[in-house]
A protein has these predicted regions:
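Membrane-interface helix termini and inter-helical loops of multi-pass transporters
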Residues: 37-44, 77-78, 107-117, 182-188, ...
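N-terminal, membrane-interfacial amphipathic/helix-forming hydrophobic leader that caps
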Residues: 1-73, 242-285
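Alpha-helical transmembrane segments and their helix-start/interface "positive-inside/aromatic belt" motifs
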Residues: 5-22, 77-93, 214-218
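Membrane-helix interface motif
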Residues: 27-40, 104-111, 233-236
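Juxtamembrane helix-loop-helix connectors linking adjacent transmembrane helices
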Residues: 44-53, 76-138, 148-158
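Transmembrane helix-loop-helix hairpins at the membrane interface
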Residues: 125-285
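Residue-level signature of transmembrane alpha-helical entry/exit and packing/kink sites
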Residues: 10-18, 45, 49-53, 57, ...
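Juxtamembrane interface elements at the cytosolic ends of transmembrane helices
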Residues: 62-77, 105, 138-142
Length: 285
């Protein structure tokens, strides 16, 4: 399929944004993290250690914001699309419910965290709610939105084959930065978190192109990370916080994969229902 010169220029810009942002993420973000870790607050306190883990993502989001503004004269939120806050909150709530019900059964030895007081738990609840927003938004843009724009710079509806190809690429792309994560390197069953990461990348891309918006995908990503950090298994992830509960087991159950599939299925059915209802209302009108 032939594309216009304007689309070719846009593709080159998207590629440059992706490359420069990733370079800034790993170089400037990494160096800033190392500098901050030399300070007592960021190296000795649990709050500081938790905050500093988000620094590379904040740098990444800053790069993305400036580059998109310079290259396309538009806000970063335009890339995400969607209907806004209601769509985000609804999807996040659905994901939290599905994840909360199913993933709890996939964990091993769940122990109540009685070390930290409720004040510290509340602090981490607020920190998680705030810091996970830029973290997950930056990852959605880099791992889902920019690859789609590079493959289809004219924003036409992707065919089935190209959509699956894009999703497969996004799945592999999403796995790569997580290869050194604690849940992969220290687990006796690393294949389960790796498959889960691939499914998140693959299914997120399919959902985003299906509903023509990445707001639901961003919301699912946010809700899943929020659940993992605040409620359970934060002890063995890179985002160590002060969860209400934590899982002492170093093994991951295959139910984690089932949880991922179920969450995407429920959200997809929800948006399919919404789409049919809107079509019916527009037809009646």
């Amino acid at each position: 399929m032939r594309i216009s010169e304007e689309a070719k220029t846009a593709r080159i810009r998207y590629i440059l944004i992706l490359v420069i942002s990733l370079a800034g993420w790993f170089s400037l973000g990494g160096m800033l993290t190392l500098v901050l870790k030399r300070l007592p607050f960021f190296s000795e306190t649990k709050t500081g250690i938790f905050i500093v883990t988000f620094v590379p993502h904040l740098v990444l989001l800053l790069f993305l914001t400036l580059l998109v503004r310079y290259a396309f004269r538009e806000k970063l939120t335009v890339l995400v699309g969607g209907k806004g806050t209601r769509e985000f909150l609804t999807t996040a709530l659905i994901t939290l419910v599905v994840t909360g019900i199913t993933e709890t059964f996939s964990l091993g030895n769940i122990v109540y965290n009685s070390t930290d007081g409720w004040g510290e738990k509340a602090l981490f609840l607020v920190l998680s709610a705030v810091l996970l927003l830029p973290q997950t938004l930056a990852e959605e843009i880099v791992f889902r939105i920019l690859p789609e724009r590079i493959l289809s710079p004219e924003e036409r509806n992707l065919g089935r084959c190209r959509r699956i190809l894009l999703a497969f690429f996004c799945g592999i792309f999403f796995v790569l930065p997580h290869l050194l994560n604690t849940e992969v390197t220290s687990s006796s069953t690393p294949v389960i978190p790796l498959v889960t990461y691939f499914l998140w990348g693959f299914l997120s891309s399919l959902l985003g192109t299906y509903v023509h918006s990445y707001v639901p995908v961003w919301a699912m990503h946010y809700a899943n990370n929020f659940f993992s950090v605040v409620i359970v298994s934060a002890e063995k992830t890179t985002l160590t916080g002060a969860p209400l509960f934590y899982d002492k087991s170093e093994e991951y159950s295959p139910l984690l994969i089932v949880t991922t599939l179920l969450a995407f299925l429920v959200v997809s059915l929800f948006f399919r229902h919404i789409g049919k209802r809107e079509d019916k209302e527009s037809f009646s009108g």
